[in-house]
Regions:
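Alpha-helical residues within the helix-turn-helix
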Residues: 13, 24, 53
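A short, Lys/Arg-rich alpha-helix, primarily the initiator
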Residues: 1-14
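DNA major-groove recognition helix of helix-turn-helix/homeodomain DNA-binding modules
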Residues: 46-61
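Short alpha-helical DNA-recognition segment
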Residues: 17-34
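Residue-level signal for the short linker/turn that defines the boundary of a DNA-recognition helix
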Residues: 6, 16-17, 43-46
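Short, charged recognition helix plus adjacent turn
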Residues: 53, 63-73
Length: 73
């Protein structure tokens, strides 16, 4: 079960970056970006901040953590 909804692909494309380019900017492998885009990998806070800066969008818009039953999952 996914713990968050990833909007990374949309923001990456809006920033006109390929997966490879974004990976190079934030210092990870392309495979990490693939897993983040499909919400199969939880980013560290540092990585989330680096991605946010690279694509020019707030962390909370890139990685959406929906509330369940009035509490965070």
């Amino acid at each position: 079960m996914k713990q968050y909804i990833s909007h990374l692909k949309r923001y990456r494309q809006f920033a006109e970056l390929t997966q490879e380019e974004l990976a190079a900017k934030v210092g990870v492998r392309r495979e990490t970006i693939v897993r983040l885009e499909s919400a199969q990998y939880n980013p560290s806070l540092k990585l989330a901040v680096d991605i946010s800066r690279a694509v020019g969008a707030p962390i909370e818009e890139i990685f959406e953590f929906p509330m369940q039953g009035g509490i965070w999952p």
